[in-house]
Swiss-Prot record:
It is found in: Nucleus, Nucleolus. Residues 20-35 have a biased composition (Polar residues). Involved in nucleolar processing of pre-18S ribosomal RNA. Has a role in the nuclear export of 40S pre-ribosomal subunit to the cytoplasm. Its main location: nucleus. This is Nucleolar protein 14 homolog. The lineage of its organism: Eukaryota, Metazoa, Ecdysozoa, Arthropoda, Hexapoda. GO terms for cellular component: Noc4p-Nop14p complex; nucleolus; small-subunit processome. It holds the Pfam family Nop14. GO terms for molecular function: snoRNA binding. Residues 190-221, 774-851 form a coiled coil.
Length: 852
């Protein structure tokens, strides 16, 4: 029941609903009580009404604006004025507040404690300075002096230790006497003396043998060096005849710089712009082909056979004047030093008499090659490349001196024909071609090829197009015959010939790119069919030479290339399927790894076979017990003798070996020696560092670097030379850096919202009839800037003036408030004093009444 005169809650709800829906046509909302005062609106009148002009400040509400400004100042300046001269926060002013926990030494703690005590003494009253009844306990690191445990030895120095008795050895040596048999003791002493004498004689004989062996070795080395030293001395003593005036003039004319022919109708600035545009176009084309954006049709690519990307120029030694792009392909320069480019300035040697020029080159330049690490990143024009006599090919460890090279050039067999005709016809058969080359030395063979190309250039006659294709096929077959049956004695000479023929092979490729590419591709296909029949064996050495040929002749950074892509897949199949059992197979694998790294130096693609092969080489360099197994991917074996093929025995002394690269004989030798084990591991460490640098920017670089850490940590570095230690340190640091990177979560690519198709508005300049003096663009911009500065300055001065008045008002209020409080205090004091005076007067009157 509900009390009388009261409504239930349901009735109230029903009444509210009925009241709200009583008038369905009443949609007007209640007007806000805060309605603007129309008298606060200030209107700025204009003298003239101009059509089209929009005035932004024709009306305003200064009262409202002033109130908002005061409110904003109260929230900013008012708050700052209220907390002025107030310290309401804790500041750490202790000594050594910026030091961490490990850096807080005993002296810092003592200085901090002393400063705190001095501040406490200053804050207390002067009378408490001499208070001796201070109950404060002195502590050290939170402990009193009584709690600190004292480790003292309370015993005096006069006490004797319990364990100072003589031991058995001392008593047996010092005591005499006994009942032993003197004859037997004498015989034992004689036998012992005889044994000792024999041992000493054996040691002396062993030392003499070692000294004799070392002496013989030093004598042999000295005999090898003696003719070189004697020859150098003899050449230095020979006085050269002074050159006459004719020779001087001839040299000046030869080496005089020649001006480049330019079009006189084109301005040099325009020529520079055209060259910059051409280089930019080539670079964009190379990047487009690397990303495979908008691949062109095969017909369109055939229609433009002469196009070369920027990377193609680099690989072909053609882009003159460009700086090296800094690729880190493992290679060796002309001095045998490790590097990615052939540094230093290249001297431009002009071709005079070709026979004498080639002989001089053989005598003045060293021939150095590297079997598995070759660099094709030297940038130069074709003429300089043809005259260059040394390129980073397989390198020989004992370097021949310049005089020795000259001696080898001078001692040409008499059966070789040193006279080369200037016009050479194209040989009809391959037998005629080989017979022509067999009559001349290595340096002269390159000259023969050059003259055959010049005499059979396609622009001279139409039939020469087939001749250059035939010459290209002959050269490929000739390289196959050279390297297929190469031996330790002639492999160096074969690589030298390949170095000299490389620019002419490039020139032939540019004469007819389509036919030459098809010819080389057919050879690669034939080699791959042979490999498929026995994929567990490495291909022959000529196949590896073809791979290096592809790396030098074609652009390896393209996303898809008709010649490079099949070779790239072929190399990965070899590295991932062929077994590694001998010195030759290890050297071939490292050679292929270097070629692959050259392939991906620009595109930075992932090559799993390279990482697996390098892990296998490090795995074989780790000594393991017979029952110990480490995880490794085929074609490498987990256990057995092949799993530790490159491991150094414990008693091997190889710490004094000099830094050496792989030699050309490694590609044709089967026996594994300790120095080869050191060189193979050293080369692998350098290749690991380079491979990790290439994938440093990839998302999954951490997964590629982690397997190397477990293998590198197991290497026994005490058996290796110092340079191997340094290379191991560099590779380990880079692998740890990449392994520590964190993976970023996958996220869909952000798509730009598609805008609606709208008509573009047409903007027209508003004409205002204001006469302004004509100024230049720079002066007009300066005038606008000065006008804005003037307006902003006036506004800033006005705001500063208003802020000052606001602060003065706050100070006045504070002063009035303090005066009011002071007046109230004075008034209260007077009031209390008057009451007190009244009480005193009353007491004095009471005393007077008592007297009377």
């Amino acid at each position: 029941m509900v009390a009388k005169g009261k409504k239930a809650s349901a009735d109230a709800v029903y009444a509210k609903k009925t009241t709200r829906s009583a008038n369905p046509f009443d949609n007007s909302t209640a007007q806000s009580s805060k309605r603007g005062n129309p008298f606060d609106v200030h209107v700025n009148k204009e003298k003239f009404k101009i059509l089209g002009r929009i005035c932004k400040h024709d009306r305003g509400m200064p009262g409202v604006s002033r109130a908002k400004a005061l409110q904003k100042r109260a929230q900013t300046l008012g708050q700052q004025f209220a907390v002025k001269h107030k310290t309401n926060r804790f500041k750490d002013n202790r000594i050594g507040k910026h030091l961490s926990g490990d850096q807080l030494t005993e002296s810092v703690m003592n200085a901090r404690y002393l400063a705190e005590k001095m501040s406490q003494v200053r804050s207390n009253q002067k009378a408490e300075k001499f208070n001796l009844n201070d109950d404060e306990l002195l502590t050290h690191r939170g402990q009193t002096l009584e709690e600190i445990e004292q480790y003292r030895d309370e015993r005096s120095d006069d006490e004797e230790l319990d364990d100072e008795a003589l031991d058995a050895d001392f008593t047996a040596a010092a005591h005499f006497g006994g009942e032993g048999d003197s004859a037997q003791d004498r015989q034992a002493a004689i036998d012992e003396m005889i044994v000792e004498q024999k041992r000493r004689k054996n040691e002396i004989a062993k030392e003499k043998d070692e000294v004799y062996d070392l002496t013989e070795k030093l004598d042999a080395n000295y005999k090898l060096l003696l003719p070189l030293v004697a020859k150098v001395t003899k050449d230095e003593q020979d006085a050269k005849p002074p050159p006459d005036a004719y020779d001087k003039l001839l040299k000046e004319m030869i080496f005089e710089p020649r001006g480049s022919v330019a079009d006189k109708l084109i301005n040099p600035d325009e020529l520079a712009k055209q060259e910059a545009a051409r280089l930019e176009k080539l670079e964009n084309e190379r990047l487009r082909r690397m990303r495979a954006d908008g691949e062109e049709d095969e017909e369109a690519s055939v229609a433009k056979p002469k196009h070369r990307s920027a990377d193609d120029l680099d690989d072909g030694y053609f882009l003159a004047g460009e700086d090296d792009e800094g690729d880190d392909t493992l290679a060796y320069d002309l001095d045998g030093n490790l590097g990615t480019h052939l540094n230093g300035k290249k001297e431009a040697v002009l071709k005079g008499d070709e026979n004498e020029d080639d002989d001089d080159k053989e005598g003045e330049e060293e021939e150095e090659e590297d079997s598995d690490e070759e660099s094709d990143s030297e940038v130069d024009n074709l003429s300089d490349l043809k005259e260059s006599e040394s390129e980073s090919e397989p390198e020989e460890a004992p370097k021949a001196s310049k005089k020795k090279a000259k001696k080898s050039a001078d001692t040409i067999p008499a059966s070789l024909d040193t006279s080369i005709p200037f016009t050479i016809k194209m040989p009809k058969t391959y037998e005629d071609f080989t017979e022509l080359l067999s009559k001349h030395a290595t340096a002269q063979k390159a000259i023969i090829i050059e003259r055959i190309i010049k005499c059979n250039h396609p622009k001279l006659e139409g039939v020469n197009r087939e001749n250059v294709v035939k010459l290209y096929s002959f050269l490929l077959q000739y390289l196959k015959d050279l390297f297929e049956d190469a031996s330790e004695q002639d492999i160096r000479e074969h690589f030298q010939l390949l170095s000299k023929l490389m620019p002419y092979l490039y020139e032939l490729t540019q004469l007819n790119p389509e036919r030459m590419s098809n010819t080389l591709l057919e050879v690669i296909k034939e080699k791959y069919e042979e490999f498929r029949k026995n994929h567990k064996m490495y291909p022959s050495l000529d196949t590896l030479v073809y791979f290096k040929l592809v790396a030098n002749l074609y652009s390896t950074s393209d996303f898809r290339h008709p010649v490079v892509t099949p070779c790239f897949i072929f190399i990965q199949h070899v590295l991932s399927r062929s077994r590694v059992r001998t010195r030759q197979e290890i050297s071939m694998g490292l050679f292929l790894v270097t070629v692959v790294l050259e392939f991906v130096s620009q595109s930075k693609r992932l090559v799993p076979a390279v990482f697996n092969f390098l892990q296998g080489i490090v795995h074989m360099s780790i000594p393991k017990r017979d029952v110990e197994q480490l995880e490794i991917t085929p074609p490498f074996e987990r256990d057995g003798p092949l799993s530790k093929l490159l491991a150094l025995p414990a008693n091997t002394e190889s710490t004094k070996l000099e830094p050496q690269q792989l030699q050309p004989t490694d590609l044709v030798t089967q026996t594994i020696t300790p120095d080869f084990k050191v060189r193979a591991l050293d080369t692998s460490l350098l290749l690991i560092k380079e491979a990790l640098q290439l994938v440093e920017e990839h998302v999954g670089a951490c997964y590629l670097a982690q397997p190397f850490l477990a293998l590198l940590s197991r290497l026994p570095l005490e058996s290796y030379p110092e340079h191997v230690h340094q290379h191991h340190k560099d590779a380990t640091e880079l692998a740890e850096k990449l392994a520590a990177q964190k993976m970023k979560p996958l996220a869909p690519a952000e798509k730009k919202p598609k805008a609606l198709r709208l008509l573009e508005p047409r903007f027209e300049a508003v004409y205002d009839d204001k006469r302004r003096p004509k100024m230049s663009k720079a002066k007009e911009e300066r005038a606008k800037l000065l006008h804005k500065i003037k307006r902003e300055k006036k506004g800033a001065i006005r705001e500063i003036r208003r802020d000052t008045s606001f602060v003065q008002m706050l100070r006045l209020k504070q002063t009035l408030q303090s005066d009011k409080e002071r007046h109230e205090k004075v008034k209260r004091i007077y009031q209390e004093a008057s009451v007190q005076q009244g009480e005193l007067n009353e007491l004095s009157r009471a005393k007077k009444k008592k007297k009377f």
